């Protein structure tokens, strides 16, 4: 059932707007798998790239993105991870979700100071 079909499923206060809806749970069917990009298509990976970075990239590739576009990129710069949104619809919002998945997969925090809450 869609959130739009359920009366009072959500509340939007004055001055707020609904940016996106992320569904959680299990569907009636398993759906269909979508093609995913390869880690090398979204990150700079070399022979000496640490395993935690590769794990983070692989987790980021599992993150939900608008229209399954996976429009983002990661790069390791010394001890810092750089993440960039690509072009596409909602790619800036997708980047926040992707960064979270990267941190879960890598087991390390990199983007905590970048997160801002209104």
Annotate each PLM feature:
Residues 1-118:
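Acidic, surface-exposed loops and disordered segments
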């Amino acid at each position: 059932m869609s959130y739009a079909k359920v009366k009072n499923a959500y509340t939007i206060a004055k001055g707020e707007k609904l940016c996106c809806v992320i569904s959680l749970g299990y569907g009636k069917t398993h759906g269909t798998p979508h093609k995913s990009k390869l880690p090398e298509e979204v990150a700079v990976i070399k022979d000496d790239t640490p395993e935690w970075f590769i794990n983070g990239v692989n987790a980021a590739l599992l993150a939900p993105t608008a229209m399954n576009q996976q429009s983002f990129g990661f790069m390791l710069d010394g001890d810092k991870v750089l993440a960039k949104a690509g072009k596409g619809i909602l790619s800036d919002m997708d980047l926040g979700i992707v960064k979270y998945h990267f941190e879960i997969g890598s087991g390390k925090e990199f983007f905590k100071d970048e997160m801002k809450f209104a």
